[in-house]
């Protein structure tokens, strides 16, 4: 080391030999004392070097004699000056980074891990998946440090930080204001040395700079190419260039600011510490004057956005070959007036002398204009969430500008327009935050030159609108949130925005004194608004200009017509309305875009003329002298009651409608009647409709709810009479409320092909809750049967309908009904639950696995640290951002979903359990068993879900049983470790579902389903079931004839002679039609079975609706069986209510009302609120 300090070049040969000697001794650094390295103070060295540069040349460098010098300083003073001028352009921040890297490189020679001592590890961490890769802490990108684990480097890491995150280096060194912009290329070339000595024969400094500059990409190239991923080719190429630069600079000289750089660091790191040189001004393709009107798209650097029309244009397909021809063409075609005005009719202005700049995305927090800067070779990447709203940019500018700034005028001019976000105040270059100094705007190159152009963006209408975040061609109103189109691409404006203000928000237009003023009363928008208001038949109101020159215009909206006091929009079809007086549905037109109110007025004139007369008389009634009507309220176009402070009378249509809606809310949400006395609810009503008076709670409990209950009950009775074939099926069960009270429920199911009360839809299944009654805890089957028979008598048999099949999940109810005269079947979903629950309990290993999964999920739910770690691992491994599911042990479906979620998050669960020190760890064998359990339970969960839909029928049970049996057989070969569970599944299915395969009700339903027919039976079974179906059809026909004959006999008893005569002629009729009637049922069944089987997605009820005319008897028989649901689950879903209020059920009166509230809660949506 000491020998190296004494070495100095004497001539060319000696210099080369000395350099080789330096290289050899550099590898053997055992002689370097570690204590001296730790005490190195690079800041003091920097200050000493600065003093040396200002005071004079260092002694001993100009001669040829040998003296003791620091390593690396072996050039003449002229060479030092030449390269001192070159390296003086570097910022102090980059110098600090370079010196810190040198320090870490020297310290790495000690017996410690070298990879953790590089300054790059302040910004990176080692990838947990691959130790040869590192991950950036800011953008979470992964970079390779080399292929061989013994030869890794951090060159690419520091290169990424300098290119993609330069602000981090600025903040890290604490000298933000010292960072200077890179000078022009002409200033970078050092002056030709006066006496270069023999070194000029090796390589001149100018040639060196030119050669280095040719190897380094331009700032434009750096901006365009992606820096997120560094390929191996780029790394190798950068290393080769760096090595060349290191050799040439070693031959020529070194900077006085980097005394030990060539000695202590490898040559490849030298190039990383140096900055690339920009191209010349004439060669930059981004310095066209057209960039005054465009800025780079934040999503795609190959596209530019026009600041005038916000349209996006491509600058070329190849990211390395971009141009501005299309931008110039767009300006000349779409904005020719701006170009001519800007250049006095000469076309596009000449090129900039320097590249255009951008406004800084993040201004310094202290408000100092010169506190932030960036080198042009380290462009500050534009933030994706950069302000695009009209307010945000100007607020940032004004908050950071000093009052004395010369540019405050321009920024203030821009702050008057909230639409400045359209332009984004951007240029194609990446943002350079050199404060808001005159250099930032290139002596006003952007704002000063474009001041006239940007005046068009100062429309005052942007005080009330903001650009839509999802579509730049639309603007959002700040008052109503409506998204309004500003035009098509290439032709946008603010006319539609002003029109919206005049029509929807006239009070805003008139309330702002400085907004548009009275001078715009003669504008086209004012004329249009006034013409529209005068052309309205129901609101013939003139435009008013107040004495404060505030223009007020009437609101022209579909909701301002007085007719809307008597109608409400139908919830099922927005093109129809419902009359509040008679409940009739009236169409407003066929096209949703062209709806009117003429039909509504005709309906009132035809059926409710007295309402119009009453309204006219109320309007004509003079108001008291003390009552003052606001001018703006008169112009709002609302009803006469909205124009005054008078309260609605009780029979007013609006008051009746509001009261009805409040009663609906009480029923739908199971609210107590005292809810109407709540202060917040009353304040809301007072604000929304001050004219409305809220009735007392007793009105709702004694009048509104009982009246609504009676109306809904009558409507359901009328719907039941429309049932096809006159058969009603039922689902019944015991429902337990949240207060542990048990209720017996009865829900009706029927098929209706044509119902005027229901909107047209493909679903012909109808259902309604008939009754709810509380039962004692020690109820018996006989008491339940008596209660059901009472309900059937009240709802079904009294109206001439027939009681069909009853589906229940209660074994006691089913047994009692089967022993009597009623038909009952078990719920399919409940049977599947019993089968799966028994199978899970049959194997101890499966139970232990479920217990382990529950503990893990419970621990994660209770531990915030585990939740946070799980979310972090999900992001790291790109797993779905899902929470773990905690199951309910009594419901196997929740356990299945819990295991599925654990398998989905398997990788994260394993790592989280280790890092959070969980006692419960899932082994590999347990993961395999868990997957087998999920594979076994999945078909049963799918079957239960399929059979629980609103459109499922009894005909799907036999096909589903065959599918599950086949699936269980296959699971023996596909799974491992759960054979006991699979055998239990198979045995339980045989014991609980085998009888279903031969039940006549299920067999007839399957035969009459055009999707299955006899395809699931053997030939012998199919032939037998076909004959049974024919006999069932004949029996139904004979029963219907007897019923028809009894009705005819009840009409009146004729005389004996006439009766005998009728009997004679009836005998003749029977003789004529004897043979055909005997063959009719068989012919229908054979013709039906000969047709092809339909796809599974087809609706069988729609099929029988089409065949109703061809096979009326067979269609009626099919509806009898296909109208029955296979599961009680759809009915149970109707009772998913919020937590009941404690006041309900405390007395017998409240319990009766609770049953009525449940009845209304379930049935109001089923009848589409038409009552």
Swiss-Prot record:
Extent of Low complexity compositional bias: 362-385
Residues annotated to bind Zn(2+) 1: 136, 139, 160, 165
GO biological process, alphabetically ordered: positive regulation of transcription by RNA polymerase II
Alphabetical UniProt keywords: Activator, Cytoplasm, DNA-binding, Isopeptide bond, Metal-binding, Nucleus, Phosphoprotein, Repeat, RNA-binding, Transcription, Transcription regulation, Ubl conjugation, Zinc, Zinc-finger
Any one GO CC term of the record: nucleoplasm
Signal peptide per UniProt: none
Protein name: Zinc finger BED domain-containing protein 4
Lineage of the species this protein comes from: Eukaryota, Metazoa, Chordata, Craniata, Vertebrata
